[in-house]
Amino acid sequence: MSPNFKLQCHFILILLTALRGESRYLEVQEAAVYDPLLLFSANLKRDLAEEQPYRRALRCLDMLSLPGQFTFTADRPQLHCAAFFIGEPEEFITIHYDLVSIDCQGGDFLKVFDGWILKGEKFPSSQDHPLPTMKRYTDFCESGLTRRSIRSSQNVAMVFFRVHEPGNGFTITIKTDPNLFPCNVISQTPSGRFTLVVPYQHQNCSFSIIYPVAIKISDLTLGHLHGLQLKKPAAGCGGTGDFVELLGGTGLDPSKMMPLADLCYPFLGPAQMKISCDNAVVRMVSSGKHINRVTFEYRQLEPFELETSTGNSIPEYCLSSL
């Protein structure tokens, strides 16, 4: 794993509304604004010790990017806690309950969410994830140890928990498994190269980069039909079933971002765009009739580029919120 996994601090705020629900499920509230509980450290990568497996205590607000065994023990009532987990793009994350000692009847809870929720927004979005939002939660207080292991649908997952009684808590083991066709991804790094392949599947896939970046698309293959590529549509991509769009915004949910460009015909690049937003997304929409593929490189914009963005970048929309 790369040692320089960093996220914009204001993107890692856990809203009180995501943790203070009275129901058994956590509701995503889009409009409310709350003060953050805490900012995560800018340097989130943990050094992997030579001993295996890696073990350490889990904090009330935490982020981890490597497998291991993690134990949370309350030293006082901890009512608004969340742990974020992220793997490599080509990995699933499995969360296994080793030991759980919480008081469900007394208001404690321990819930796994398939994806991330930040500032009331979800990744993957409801449009991109195969399950409805409520099905993406696994509540220990409902299932108990009958379901000891929960595997994510992508390279990110998170745990919400509340523990009232000091001394209570839980131990979980985080493992990763290979994902041959990663669909929805949050990048651990501000620069890299990736090929997104969707083979004959009717689904939407988003690759999220939580930095202002320059994206260069070097290869795009869409709509192979009997060995021939579909012709370029007369106008726009709205009428096609297979296309790639570039999105930008200040939140995490791709469905709430601004479309900056769309591509719906094959080409051999390069095509480049600077996206000055806090979050940039390469999103592929597939009809399921073809094998679609897009290869792209991305790098974080330098400060001087943010100040002097011109040409085919989109500074007006994004920089106003920085």
Swiss-Prot record:
Belongs to the CRF-binding protein family. One of its GO terms (molecular function) is corticotropin-releasing hormone binding. Keywords: Disulfide bond, Glycoprotein, Secreted, Signal. It comes from Mus musculus. Disulfide bonds join C60-C81, C104-C141, C183-C205, C237-C264, C277-C318. Binds CRF and inactivates it. May prevent inappropriate pituitary-adrenal stimulation in pregnancy. GO terms for biological process: behavioral response to ethanol; cellular response to calcium ion; cellular response to cAMP; cellular response to cocaine; cellular response to estradiol stimulus; cellular response to estrogen stimulus; cellular response to gonadotropin-releasing hormone; cellular response to immobilization stress. This is Corticotropin-releasing factor-binding protein. The keyword 4Fe-4S does not apply. It is found in: Secreted. Its main location: secreted. Glycans are attached at N204. InterPro entries: CRF-bd, CRF-BP_C, CRF-BP_N, Sperma_CUB_dom_sf. Residues 1-24 form the signal peptide. It comes from the Eukaryota. GO terms for cellular component: axon terminus; dendrite; dense core granule; extracellular space; microtubule; multivesicular body; nucleus; perikaryon.
